[in-house]
From Swiss-Prot:
Biological source species: Methylorubrum extorquens (strain ATCC 14718 / DSM 1338 / JCM 2805 / NCIMB 9133 / AM1) (Methylobacterium extorquens)
Cofactor requirement: Mg(2+)
Free-text cofactor note: Binds 1 Mg(2+) ion per subunit.
Name this protein carries in UniProt: Malate--CoA ligase subunit beta
Enzyme Commission no: 6.2.1.9
The reaction(s) this protein catalyses: (S)-malate + ATP + CoA = (S)-malyl-CoA + ADP + phosphate
Record flagged with keyword Magnesium: yes
Pathway: One-carbon metabolism; formaldehyde assimilation via serine pathway
Subunit comment: Heterotetramer of two alpha and two beta subunits.
Residues that hold Mg(2+) according to the record: N199, D213
Coiled coil: none
Length: 390
């Protein structure tokens, strides 16, 4: 789960990470009120969306007067901000963060990620923070400072000092940076984070170290014990189909292809997507109906897939163990009767009660394409998709 910048900063501040003063606003008038309460004469008005690269997309505006603050908020609120990380559809801006724009001398980068290959937390830092860090990481990986954390002991002070010195800081700045690095790690660890990015981490003229921006993501599987974080969820920033799927205990992730997938089991779902790609097609989604899928759940899965207007064909691939092929077949028939399926439907069933499932489909009178193997099913789905486009 992702959170907004201001929410990430509230969490970081609670762990002792220094952040600029700021306040969230949902209207231009609230933005002006926030600026007056914060004081000063220079503010940043930041669009709050679950994506980075806002600066290059015009999502961060610097203001020197209250009128400029009002105009900036009015320009951002209610719009869809398109950045390099949002895709062409963008993300809706329903709130802005008004922050004191303190002058600074240097921009650094600090990040924490779960390195799944190493099975460790990896701390990443760089002297070259700011908007171009992605390009720097891709073209000049040697510019990144990387430290792997041993989970039995956690991030150590000597590792934080090593990072701080490699960032080229003076003695006074090193002390502040070490505190920031250690406290940010505690926030990442204690909140079940999967990603924390502070970009930029700035150094001011008086040697303070501030988190000028922050992005945090959290492990969905741990939210049951992090209710304060779960309550930060903003459904407007996600795919509404994913939220609907979660309500029915379905795992759904929308993609940009044209072949909808309804599969049981995450591994089989990924294999199905791979086979579609291998056959020359593009999957429109990842959808795992899980074990023990009832006819109602399968019908819901169809409604989710068909809500994507890009879908030109649907591939149902079920290997029934805990599940039952006859239940899935009943769900397919139920969906066809309740939802207009106007795209080719390819079905491959195997496992428990497969003969009963095939019989239900055969007697349903549905216009569908059957397959006995995954390779055959993927090939037929791609052929049907291409035929539907012509």
């Amino acid at each position: 789960m992702d959170v907004h910048e201001y929410q990430a900063k509230e969490l970081l501040a609670s762990f002792g990470v220094a952040v600029p003063k700021g306040a969230v606003a949902f209207s231009p008038d609230q933005a002006v009120y926030a600026a007056t309460e914060l004081g000063g004469s220079f503010w940043a008005v930041k669009a709050q969306i679950h994506a980075g690269a806002r600066g290059k997309a015009g999502g961060i505006k610097l203001c020197r007067t209250y009128n400029e603050v009002r105009d900036a908020a009015r320009d951002l609120l209610g719009k869809r901000l398109v950045t390099l990380q949002t895709g062409p559809e963008g993300k809706p801006v329903q709130r802005v963060y008004v922050e004191t724009a303190d002058p600074f001398e240097r921009e650094l980068y600090l990040g924490y990620v779960l390195d799944r290959k190493a099975e460790r937390v990896r701390v990443i830092a760089s002297q070259r923070g700011g908007m171009d860090i992605e390009e720097i990481a891709a073209k000049e990986p040697e510019a990144l400072i990387q430290v792997v954390v041993e989970p039995a002991v956690g991030l150590q002070q000597f590792q934080a000092r090593e990072i701080a010195f490699q960032l080229g800081l003076n003695i006074k700045q090193v002390s502040a940076a070490v505190k920031t690095i250690m406290n940010a790690y505690r926030a990442f660890r204690d909140c079940d984070g999967t990603m924390l990015e502070i970009n930029p981490l700035v150094v001011t003229k008086d040697d303070r170290v501030l988190a000028l921006d922050a992005k945090m993501s959290f492990d969905d599987n741990a939210l049951f014990r992090r209710r304060n974080i779960a309550d930060m969820h903003d459904p407007s920033q996600g795919d509404p189909r994913e939220a609907q799927a979660a309500e029915h205990n379905l795992s759904y992730i929308g993609l940009e292809g044209e072949i909808g997938c309804i599969v049981n089991g995450a591994g089989l779902a990924m294999a199905t997507m791979d086979m579609i790609k291998h056959a020359g097609g593009e999957p429109a989604n990842f959808l795992d109906v899980g074990g023990g899928a009832s006819p109602d759940r399968v019908a819901t899965a169809f409604r989710l897939v068909l809500s994507d207007r890009n879908v030109k064909a649907i591939l149902v691939n079920i290997f029934a163990g805990i599940n039952r092929c006859d239940w899935v077949a009943e769900g397919v028939v139920k969906a066809a009767r309740e939802v207009k399926i106007d795209v080719p439907l390819i079905v491959r069933l195997a496992g428990t009660n497969v003969d009963e499932g095939k019989k239900i489909l055969a007697e349903s009178g549905l216009d569908l394409i059957t397959a006995d193997t995954l390779t055959e099913a993927a090939r037929k789905a791609v052929e049907a998709c291409h035929g539907a486009k012509h």
